Amino acid sequence: TGASAHPRIPTWVADLRVPGVVLHSSEYLYPRQVLTSDVLIVGGGNSGVQLARELAPSHAVTLAVRTPRRHQPAARYLRRQFLARGPRPEPVFEDSYEQLRDAGVRICPAVAKAGKSSVTFVDGTVTTPSSVILATGFDPGDDWLPDSARIDPPQRAMTGIPGLFVAGIPQYGGRGSDTIAGVWRDATAIARRIIERP
């Protein structure tokens, strides 16, 4: 269970055949796993940027980025994350895209679809990667919850089942719930609701 329990795999991956590997970032350990000379990394968040930086010295790296991310110091983000409202892309704390370009990384837009051996980006350009790493994030491990537990709109730590609360999953608690620093808000809300129950 948790906010990052299941690797998120794009549906187009099922149509793709490459001579090398197709890995989710959760399966990646070191550059030697990617035996081919080139690699497409899908996802421009922190994991994708870190992988691009690590693989750039030994591979021809293409980084597919769906949403441009702001680059900022982690400390500034941590101060502001709790004040943020609404869904926004997480900022990138590692190298900027410009630094990656300087390291030889090719930055491309998001992947639209895949054919047998090729990938088409949303701008219509096509590449034929030898290997692919999916830095596409995770889905929460809330599949153990019955459908009746999900409420819309979500309320901090609440479910649709009286007496059942959820902590640590942003879909139930809000931005930052999946961090040590942020889960306290879920715990506080749960404690308050338990105390206030008749």
PLM features: residue spans?
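Flavin (primarily FAD) cofactor-binding/catalytic cores of flavoenzymes
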Residues: T1-P198
